[in-house]
């Protein structure tokens, strides 16, 4: 089994789909300028409708630390995913506040990850661009990691069998015409859960 996160939920209809498929986590995007960005009010609505077995991750870039902490303190999100510089001071601040942090990195700088969890992605997150899995095989991190970058129902099994991630993270790969697709979500969750033998991540995060 490989865990899976469905990223970029925007609508109540998206929550209905993931509640049926039961991925291990979902992502809500708060990063400025991103197509899938949602407001705190929308995120609160979605989180209240979400099955409590699914972990809630907030995705950030240049957001202020105060905004991130507010989302955690109001129980809208449980985990913070940061796309920022390697030495971003917010990582230490969040960890000091006992907030679980996922740090998004390219494979080239993965060894510099300072956060609780490592996510490997390409330089343009959410673009659907596929990572070079053959290259990643020779650069595979020692620690468990999350794999993102161009994953689809068609290539997910190959990706898992090549690089053995603990979790996969998908956004555009479960969309049709820019919206979440029920059939693709179901396929992705089913295939991820049926493939791989990895150490699960995020299991110790308290549900609230």
UniProtKB/Swiss-Prot annotation:
Q: Which Pfam families match?
A: PRAI
The record ties this protein, via CDD domains, to: PRAI
EC code(s) of this entry:
5.3.1.24
Does the record's keyword annotation contain Isomerase?
yes
Q: Which pathway does the UniProt entry assign to this protein?
A: Amino-acid biosynthesis; L-tryptophan biosynthesis; L-tryptophan from chorismate: step 3/5
Where are the annotated coiled coils located? none
- Catalytic activity as recorded in UniProt: N-(5-phospho-beta-D-ribosyl)anthranilate = 1-(2-carboxyphenylamino)-1-deoxy-D-ribulose 5-phosphate
Keyword line: Amino-acid biosynthesis, Aromatic amino acid biosynthesis, Isomerase, Tryptophan biosynthesis
Q: Supply the source organism for this entry.
A: Lactiplantibacillus plantarum (strain ATCC BAA-793 / NCIMB 8826 / WCFS1)
Keyword hit for Oxidoreductase: no
Molecular-function annotations in GO:
phosphoribosylanthranilate isomerase activity
- Report the domain of life of the source organism: Bacteria
The EC category is isomerase
The text of the family note is:
Belongs to the TrpF family.
Kindly state a single biological-process term from the GO annotations of this entry: L-tryptophan biosynthetic process
Instruction: Supply the name of the protein.
Output: N-(5'-phosphoribosyl)anthranilate isomerase
Which Gene3D superfamilies did the record assign? Answer: Aldolase class I
Q: What gene makes this protein?
A: trpF
């Amino acid at each position: 089994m490989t865990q899976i996160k469905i990223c970029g939920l925007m609508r109540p209809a998206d929550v209905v789909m993931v509640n049926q498929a039961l991925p291990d986590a979902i992502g809500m995007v708060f990063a400025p300028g991103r197509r899938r960005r949602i407001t705190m009010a929308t995120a609160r609505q979605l989180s209240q409708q979400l099955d409590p077995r699914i972990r809630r991750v907030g995705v950030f870039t240049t957001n202020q630390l105060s905004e991130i902490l507010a989302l955690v303190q109001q129980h809208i999100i449980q985990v913070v995913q940061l796309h920022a510089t390697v030495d971003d001071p917010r990582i230490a601040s969040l960890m000091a506040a006992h907030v679980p942090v996922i740090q998004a990195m390219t494979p080239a700088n993965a060894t510099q990850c300072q956060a609780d969890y490592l996510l490997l992605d390409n330089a343009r997150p959410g673009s659907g661009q596929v990572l070079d899995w053959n290259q990643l095989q020779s650069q595979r991190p020692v620690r468990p990691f999350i794999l993102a970058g161009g994953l689809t129902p068609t290539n997910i099994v190959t990706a898992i069998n090549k690089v053995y991630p603990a979790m996969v993270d998908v956004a555009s790969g479960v969309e049709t015409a820019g919206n979440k697709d029920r059939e693709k979500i179901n396929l992705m969750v089913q295939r991820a859960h049926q493939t791989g033998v990895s150490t699960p991540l995020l299991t110790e995060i308290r549900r609230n």
